[in-house]
Amino acid sequence: MSKAIIKFVRLSPTKARLIAREVQGMNAELALASLQFMPNRGAKFIANAISSAVANGGFEPEEVVVSSCRVDAGPVLKRFRPRARGTASKIRKPTSHVMVEVSKAQKKEA
């Protein structure tokens, strides 16, 4: 089993979790292929984490399974936008920590 962590990704964790749930339990090669054609911005970061986890273990993508894909909330960058009458409104720019673990696929006995 090997893992990869990408920290401080400028992406909302709620949006990234939608993609992380899709690839969990998938074959790594199939997960990378499906993430390549997803229109979401977070798919690129999760694909990078999966390929990094595969490389960290010294595996080939077709022989491993994404055992866990987790997206945790990172620190929130706070900005202000000037508004009418001298006031300001908050802008929250959330960040995420993407954690991916891959492990060898269990061989099914026939």
From Swiss-Prot:
UniProt cross-references to InterPro entries, sorted A to Z: Ribosomal_uL22 (IPR001063), Ribosomal_uL22_bac/chlpt-type (IPR005727), Ribosomal_uL22_bac/org-type (IPR047867), Ribosomal_uL22_sf (IPR036394)
GO cellular component terms, A-Z: cytosolic large ribosomal subunit
Ranges of compositional bias, category Basic residues: 85-95
Listed GO biological process terms: translation
Keyword Membrane attributed: no
Keyword presence, Transcription regulation: no
Keyword annotations from UniProtKB, A to Z: Ribonucleoprotein, Ribosomal protein, RNA-binding, rRNA-binding
GO MF entry, a single one: rRNA binding
Pfam short name (any one): Ribosomal_L22
Region (Disordered): 85-110
Subunit and partners: Part of the 50S ribosomal subunit.
Family: Belongs to the universal ribosomal protein uL22 family.
Record function comment: This protein binds specifically to 23S rRNA; its binding is stimulated by other ribosomal proteins, e.g. L4, L17, and L20. It is important during the early stages of 50S assembly. It makes multiple contacts with different domains of the 23S rRNA in the assembled 50S subunit and ribosome.
Protein name per Swiss-Prot or TrEMBL: Large ribosomal subunit protein uL22
Annotated source species: Campylobacter curvus (strain 525.92)
Gene encoding the protein: rplV
